[in-house]
């Protein structure tokens, strides 16, 4: 399958090549900057020490910034299951969007069409499992909110790009804001750790604060129309359904 890209290489990557089988993950990001040109400047500035493999513009054009077999600097401090520092074994895709700090907005249809095409190409090329297609906030719960609650995870999952639950929406919504017991809340967090979210709490952050961020990261991906940082029966049911899919 031919993939049409524009070349605009970033100097920010590790010099040592990796091998095909090291590439196990795709990580989605939004740029989180006021405009597209600023984002491109930052990703190609040697002093910024950040980059990605692919950049998707508002008009759907795909820019290749780092060759796949080199490690781009997009994930930062990160964790998923038993993997740390996911730069080593992932492909990073940045999608132009101002993000939560600059007027977060819906991704364009052209962006999503290109993302679909690019993801399918990478999945086939590197035999990447749907379970290993993640958002930046999945792997860096305390630091990141991207790609955020406007990112079309459910739509992408229908094309085997990422995982989504298989619960009936109407039935599920009836459980929204219904409180859980302490035991059920513990069960919810255990489900998240089984899915892959990190158990490790930074020394600088209280357990309560970390768990609140963790709930929000989960909601931004799987319960996108209400991010309140609270566990309810709806969240619990979704987590139970997902555990089966991630194992």
Identify the residue ranges that each predicted region occupies.
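Active-site-adjacent loop/helix surface patches within enzyme catalytic domains
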Residues: 2-131
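Basic/polar, cationic surfaces and motifs that engage anionic cell-wall
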Residues: 99, 104-201, 213, 217-223
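A glycine-rich, coil/turn loop motif that links secondary-structure elements
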Residues: 202-212, 228-235
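Extracellular LysM carbohydrate-binding repeats and other cell-envelope/extracellular binding modules
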Residues: 224-247
């Amino acid at each position: 399958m031919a993939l049409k890209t524009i070349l605009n290489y970033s100097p920010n990557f590790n010099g040592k090549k990796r091998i095909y089988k090291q590439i196990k993950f795709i990580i989605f990001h939004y740029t989180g900057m006021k405009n597209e040109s600023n984002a491109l400047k930052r990703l190609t500035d040697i002093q910024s020490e950040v980059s990605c493999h692919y950049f998707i513009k508002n008009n759907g054009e795909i820019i290749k910034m780092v060759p796949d077999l080199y490690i781009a600097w997009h994930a930062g401090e990160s964790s998923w299951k038993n993997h740390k520092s996911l730069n080593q074994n992932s492909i990073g895709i940045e999608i132009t969007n101002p993000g939560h700090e600059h007027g977060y907005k819906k991704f364009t249809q052209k962006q999503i069409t290109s993302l679909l095409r690019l993801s399918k190409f990478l999945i086939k090329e590197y035999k990447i499992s749907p379970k290993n297609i993640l958002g930046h906030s999945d792997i860096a719960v305390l630091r990141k909110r991207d790609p955020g609650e406007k990112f079309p995870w459910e739509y992408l999952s229908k094309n085997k790009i990422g995982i989504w639950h298989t619960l009936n929406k109407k039935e599920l919504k009836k459980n929204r804001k219904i409180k859980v017991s302490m035991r059920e809340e513990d069960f919810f967090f255990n489900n998240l750790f089984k899915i892959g979210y990190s158990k490790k709490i930074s020394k600088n952050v209280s357990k309560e604060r970390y768990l609140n961020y963790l709930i929000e990261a989960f909601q931004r991906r799987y319960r996108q129309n209400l991010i309140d940082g609270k566990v309810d029966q709806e969240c619990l049911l979704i987590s139970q359904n997902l555990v089966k899919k991630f194992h």
